[in-house]
Regions:
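Acyl-thioester-processing domains in fatty-acid/polyketide/NRPS systems
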Residues: 1-289
Length: 289
């Protein structure tokens, strides 16, 4: 495979429901959508000589928020492409921006990921992944989550019913919300809403047990075994693995109603990205000492 670096201009559609994806009063482009864009570009351009299975990605980072303006309909972006070998390719989604005085134009990367042209067998889930724990559980109603803890609009209310939190992890029923019918990449990686909802669960868990509003900043590996489908329900297990230098690490397992593993994320990294300006409400820490 050619090891040269390629930069491809992109015009990305901004669908109306993206306006419900907000952080600190600003609308931000969803990270799961950025991954769909990158996977779709690989599929369109046929970078691999073998069949491309887009559901295997690693070393993924959500570098900077891509802020959207109210009513914005498109994003003029760049995709930086760097083939690694015959089975791996690294891509990043970036935009141009001007310095404050307008004298210079620079590139800002928003998402980077390495995609693999290979598949892996579905692992056997251990009991901790399949069954809820027997330790005390703190339950959080969905309306409280999206009103006070993860204040996204209705289009991104992926957690159904109530979220169950224990020291050993978060347990959620998720709804794959509808994608825009005009989205050409809507089936590329399956629905992005279940993973987005799992990140919401990790954010709430972080608020309860660590007192920090943690948002995803990347992951080590994500494998999609069975693409999720819009309008369907799924179950997420968000399992804490480590805490270091302000970053919380999780593994995420998303299963369907039959108990089949749909996707697994290892080394999901979450941290406070507000600089300490956003803090959890007191009630979510009730009983934590």
């Amino acid at each position: 495979m050619d090891s040269s670096f390629t930069q491809v201009p992109l015009t990305i559609a901004v669908y109306p429901h993206f306006m419900d994806h907000c952080f600190a009063g600003k609308v931000v482009f969803p990270a799961v959508e950025a991954l769909k864009i990158l996977a779709g570009l690989i599929g369109e351009r046929d970078f691999f000589t073998s069949a491309f299975a887009p559901g295997h990605m690693a070393d993924t980072r959500f570098n900077k928020f891509l802020v959207l303006e109210p009513g914005q309909e498109t994003i003029e972006a760049l995709c930086n492409i760097r083939p690694i070998d015959d089975t791996r390719i690294s891509l990043s989604l970036a935009t141009r921006f001007s310095t404050k005085n307008g004298a210079m134009t620079r590139i800002r990367e928003h998402c980077t990921a390495t995609f693999y042209a290979k598949t892996e067998p579905v692992p056997n889930l251990s009991p901790v992944h399949v069954h809820e724990c027997e330790e005390p559980v703190f339950k959080v109603a969905t309306d409280s989550i999206y009103r006070e803890l993860v204040p996204f609009g209705p289009a991104f209310h992926s957690i159904k019913d109530e979220l169950r939190l224990a020291r050993s992890g978060a347990y959620a029923t998720l709804k794959a919300m509808p994608d825009d019918p005009d989205d050409p990449f809507k089936t590329m990686l399956g629905s992005g809403f279940p993973l987005d909802g799992a990140f919401h669960a990790g954010c709430v868990w972080s608020q309860r047990f660590f007192g920090v509003v943690a948002f995803p900043v990347g992951f080590d590996k994500r494998i999609i075994y069975k693409p999720t489908v819009e309008h369907q329900d799924y179950t997420a297990r968000v399992i804490p693995q480590y805490q270091t230098h302000g970053t919380l690490g999780f593994d995420i397992w998303i299963t369907d109603k039959q108990g089949d593993l749909c996707e697994a994320v290892s080394g999901a990294m979450m941290r406070d990205v507000s600089g300490g300006t956003i803090t959890p409400p007191a009630w979510i820490r009730e009983g934590i000492y």
